[in-house]
Amino acid sequence: GPESSREVHDAIELLNAERIGHGIHIINDVPVMDLCQEKNVTLEICPTSNWLTSAVPTTAKHPIKRLMNYGVPVTINSDDPSLFGIDLCHEYEILHREHGFTEKDFHACNQRAANASFIDATEKARVWRNL
């Protein structure tokens, strides 16, 4: 809700956050989406976790594709695999089946994840070569 968007805004503006875990409620706050886009702040999206914690009513209604289409940088994540019993392949399957994600979409999210990682540029280049 509005509090969540405000927290994302404050994390970016006051704490200089470069990545935000979850943060999907900014879909209803255009200025915060603009801020993420402008400052290149990446949202770490966890579709199944967002559904299981009632942040979204179903995985099919998850706003990830709308966030991407708006230009908000996002990555695909599995949150806590041991708690939720899922892995990244599970998230990919859901996004492909329910949101029409293509190989190009997954590639873009993986590129974003590599770029947004906190490792140095040399290590990023090595990791990306192996993807």
For the regions a protein language model found, what residue spans apply to each?
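Active-site core of metal-dependent hydrolases
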Residues: 1-55
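Short acidic/histidine-rich active-site segments
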Residues: 1-2, 67-87
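Short acidic (Asp/Glu) and glycine-rich catalytic loops that position anionic groups and cofactors
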Residues: 16, 43-45, 70-75, 88-93
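C-terminal helical cap(s) of enzyme catalytic domains, especially alpha/beta-barrels
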Residues: 32, 88-100
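Short beta-alpha connecting loops at secondary-structure transitions
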Residues: 47-53, 75-77, 93-98
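Charged helix-capping and loop-helix junction motifs
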Residues: 57-65
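Mid-to-C-terminal alpha-helical segments outside catalytic/metal-binding sites
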Residues: 90, 100-131
